[in-house]
Amino acid sequence: MRAINNILLAFLFTWSASAFGQNAFKVVPLGVKGGIDESNLSAYMLAPANSNNFVCLDAGTLHTGIEKAIEKGAFKIPAEQVLRKYIKGYLISHSHLDHLSGLIINSPEDTTKNIYAFADCIETFKTRYFTWKSWANFADEGETPQLKKYHYKVLSPNEETQIENTEMTVKAFPLSHSNLTSSAFLVKSQDSYILYLGDVGPDEIEKSHNLELLWQTMAPLIQEKKLKAIMIEVSFPDEQPDKTLFGHLTPHWLMKEMDDLEKLSGGGSLKDFNIVVTHVKPPQASINSIKKQLAAENKLQLNLIYPQQGKAILF
C-alpha cells in the first residue's frame, strides 16, 4: 500500500510540475529586427525546454546572433558548434533576403540538414540563391554540381511534418505578404505549441482570409492552454499609411487581429497571453513609437514581449 501511495505521490508531483509553471519551449533570438541592420535580422532558435535540438525559425542572421547568445549565457559551446550541432534544420517563412541571408552566408561552415518551406520559397532557393552565379549550390536539387549539404523539405499547408533530429513537429499555414506568400509555423512539442508568423499584412488590407483561418485553428489551443506564445511581427508605427505597409502590421492592426482572435477563443482568454513582437523596423525612434502605441492599445492585457538578440526566453 505504501508503494502505491509513493507512486501516486510521484505522479501527482509530476502532473503538478507540468500543470503549474513548467516550461515547454526555449527560444533564443538570433535576430529580432526587420531591416537595415544586417547583424540583427529575423532568426529564432526554438527547442523543447529540456533539449538542445533546435530548429531555426527563419535565418536572417545566424553567426552574429549566436555570438551574442554565447555572451549572454544561452550557450556554453563555441559559435561554430552551435551552428553545426545545435541547429538541426531551418523553417523559412518566405524568400525575402532578410529572412534567409544568414543561412546562405553561413552555408560553407554548416552541416547537413533540412530546409523546410512552402514550394515557392524552395523554388527561389533553387533558382536564385543556391546557384553558381550568385553563390554555390549547397543543396541536393537545382543547378549542378550539387554539394548536397541541404535537403529541401516541401511543406504542405496544414499538414503535420516531423522536424528531423528534434522532438518537434510543424504545421505550416499560408500568410499574405503583399505580392508574396509568407507562412506561419505551428510547432508542437509533446502537448504544447508555439506559433511563429513570418511577415504578414492584415486581412482587411491584404483582401485575404489567411489570418482569420489561422486564428480559427489557434482558438481551441488557447482555450485548452496548450498554445504557449504567438510570435508575430509589428514592422511600423501607426503613422505608417496603410497603402505603404507592403504586407506588414502596425500596433493598430496587430490589436485588430488580436480582437478577432479573442472573439474566437473567448472573452478574457488572451489576458496575460504571451505575444512576442518581432520584425520591428529601425530607426530606434520608430521602434520606441511601436512599443508606446502597443502599450496604449493593449486593451486585451496581452503580455507583450520584446525579444533581445541573444537573450533566451522560456515559455
Predicted region positions:
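Active-site HxH/HxHxD metal-binding segment of metal-dependent hydrolases
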Residues: 77-145
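Metallo-beta-lactamase
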Residues: 24, 30, 120-182, 190, ...
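Pre-active-site segment of Zn-dependent metallo-hydrolases
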Residues: 36-91, 101-108, 206, 210-217
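Divalent metal-coordination and catalytic microenvironments
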Residues: 27, 44, 58, 94, ...
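Active-site neighborhood of phospho(di)ester-bond hydrolases with catalytic His/Asp-centered motifs
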Residues: 56-60, 86-98, 116-118, 196-199, ...
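Zn-dependent metallo-beta-lactamase
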Residues: 2-54, 61-63
